[in-house]
Swiss-Prot record:
Region (Disordered): 348-376
Superkingdom field: Eukaryota
Protein name according to UniProt: Glypican-6
Comp. bias (Low complexity): 348-357
Gene assigned in the entry: GPC6
Localisation: Cell membrane
A GO biological process held by the record: regulation of neurotransmitter receptor localization to postsynaptic specialization membrane
Length: 555
């Protein structure tokens, strides 16, 4: 064979071998792709009837293709929208759990307070009549403050309850001693004997413990449901990065461009794409799981010793027992008060005579439990807590499991049983790269998504901080302590640029304010405070002098 024939035939053979399969005479038809593309709601004017050269493609393989530049752009945007919807749908359970249970618990607690107030009012009107109605604002104020505390008001429960018993003592002391006139100063002196005389027996002490820890647990638990709801709602609204959008397009719609619209992504391929796109969400999981554990701890308290229903339901009877105790010991109480505060002035004869029949000698009448209002919100706290505990347990690890939940959907991938007939990002074949671990730092070698592991998502970090703050509150509530965090920024708003703090790098700027008020006389608080400050200053000065002296000796 002449040498020139070989020089011509060999290049021709190479050209033929480089052509796509089926492109021996003419390009393949794009009919199947046109049908699938049109079903997505796109105009068929964008798509060619036959494959064209793919040098214009920016994401998909630049081979013969059914995609124009316009199609690639539209399908890229479509993949972004579908991904956002997928994440919202997949996190639907956790979001609805917190939304619906917050509503139920909030309704229950509010109605419980309303029922308790109504029950006390009905009982006291029936038992004490006009005497109660003339002094009803003392009890109304008690419930107003309890409601204000529950709804987030700055109320110190212990101080508020102490004030209630002091006011009640002042009113009752006047009623059991109608023959005397008491000035405001005298009544203030009377109230100072509340702790010393214990006119109401042990009821105030027990009720203070029960009410304080029950309300702390109830309020903090509902706040926890609020934070969980807000975090879940915010995190489920993802904003994919350009690198993520590129990977989504390549996985979901590059099969269209290759003329394979019915071929679904390989399962492991899908996992790597989702782990790259949801790397920051996975990092939320650690703090989220700690938050869920803390919620479960407080839930146990709610159905146990901190059960607000068991505290509020009989509160009218308990206060009546306290009043009865005061009546029975009225002589001794009056004598000790007169001894400590001095003999009061007699009341005018006309007033004394008119008040005599109205003195507080009505005896306590046991209240029939059958007369109590129906259970708050048509349910009981035990049933609510049992339900929420099950739901909370199911919501653990929800964020790190998002990729697995999304990729196991039959409409999303070819499944694990069809690993040879799936889209691997380049062709219909097995996906070979290994699956990445969860979290941002593990995506450094992700083969599908370009992830900058040095730039954590600020928005997700804000949610991590919100969960961390709430978890601390819940732990304190579990121990019966009320901690109010007074932060300069909204702890869970997610607004603004954020701190960008990771884990414990940034210091928290929270001031702890507890309901455990120090047992200090009100008149001495300023003195003690300034004395403490002077003491600290003196101590600091003394230590400085000692250090300087030691330094001189060492020389």
């Amino acid at each position: 064979m002449p040498s020139w024939i070989g020089a011509v035939i060999l290049p021709l053979l190479g050209l033929l071998l480089s052509l796509p399969a089926g492109a021996d005479v003419k390009a393949r038809s794009c009919g199947e792709v046109r049908q699938a593309y049109g079903a997505k709601g796109f105009s068929l004017a964008d798509i060619p009837y036959q494959e064209i050269a793919g040098e214009h493609l920016r994401i998909c393989p630049q081979e013969y293709t059914c995609c124009t530049t316009e199609m690639e752009d539209k399908l890229s945007q479509q993949s972004k929208l579908e991904f956002e919807n997928l994440v919202e749908e997949t996190s639907h359970f956790v979001r609805t759990t917190f939304v619906s249970r917050h509503k139920k618990f909030d309704e229950f607690f509010r109605e419980l307070l309303e029922n308790a107030e109504k029950s006390l009012n009905d009982m006291f009107v029936r038992t004490y009549g006009m005497l109660y109605m003339q002094n009803s604002e003392v009890f109304q104020d008690l419930f107003t403050e309890l409601k204000r505390y529950y709804t987030g008001g700055n109320v110190n429960l212990e101080e508020m309850l102490n004030d209630f018993w002091a006011r009640l003592l002042e009113r009752m002391f006047q009623l059991i001693n109608p023959q005397y006139h008491f000035s405001e100063d005298y009544l203030e002196c009377v109230s100072k004997y509340t702790d010393q005389l214990k006119p109401f027996g042990d009821v105030p002490r027990k009720l203070k413990i029960q009410v304080t820890r029950a309300f702390i647990a109830a309020r903090t638990f509902v706040q926890g449901l609020t934070v969980g709801r807000e975090v879940a709602n915010r995190v489920s609204k993802v904003s994919p990065t350009p690198g993520c959008i590129r990977a989504l397009m390549k996985m979901l719609y590059c099969p269209y461009c290759r003329g394979l619209p019915t071929v679904r992504p390989c399962n492991n391929y899908c996992l790597n794409v989702m782990k790259g796109c949801l790397a920051n969400q996975a990092d939320l999981d650690t703090e989220w799981n700690l938050f869920i554990d803390a919620m479960l701890l407080v839930a146990e308290r709610l159905e146990g010793p901190f059960n607000i229903e068991s505290v509020m339901d009989p509160i009218d009877v308990k206060i009546s027992e306290a009043i009865m105790n005061m009546q029975e010991n009225s002589m001794q109480v009056s004598a000790k008060v007169f001894q400590g505060c001095g003999q009061p002035k007699p009341a005018p004869a006309l007033r004394s005579a008119r008040s005599a029949p109205e003195n507080f000698n009505t005896r306590f009448r046991p209240y029939n439990p059958e007369e109590r209002p129906t259970t708050a919100a048509g349910t009981s706290l035990d049933r609510l807590v049992t339900d929420i505990k099950e739901k909370l347990k199911l919501s653990k690890k929800v964020w790190s499991s998002l990729p697995y939940t999304i990729c196991k959907d039959e409409s999303m991938t070819a499944g694990t049983s069809n690993e040879e007939e799936c889209w691997n990002g380049h062709s219909k074949a097995r996906y070979l790269p290994e699956i990445m671990n969860d979290g941002l730092t593990n995506q450094i070698n992700n083969p599908e998504v370009d992830v900058d592991i040095t730039r954590p998502d600020t928005f997700i970090r804000q949610q991590i901080m919100a969960l961390r703050v709430m978890t601390n509150k819940l732990k304190n509530a579990y121990n019966g302590n009320d901690v109010n965090f007074q932060d300069t920024s909204d702890e869970s708003s997610g607004s603004g640029s954020g701190s960008g703090c990771i884990d414990d790098v940034c210091p928290t700027e929270f001031e702890f304010v507890t309901t455990e008020a120090p047992a200090v006389d009100p008149d001495r608080r300023e003195v003690d405070s300034s004395a403490a400050q002077r003491g600290h200053s003196l101590l600091s000065w003394s230590l400085t002098c000692i250090v300087l002296a030691l330094q001189r000796l060492c020389r």
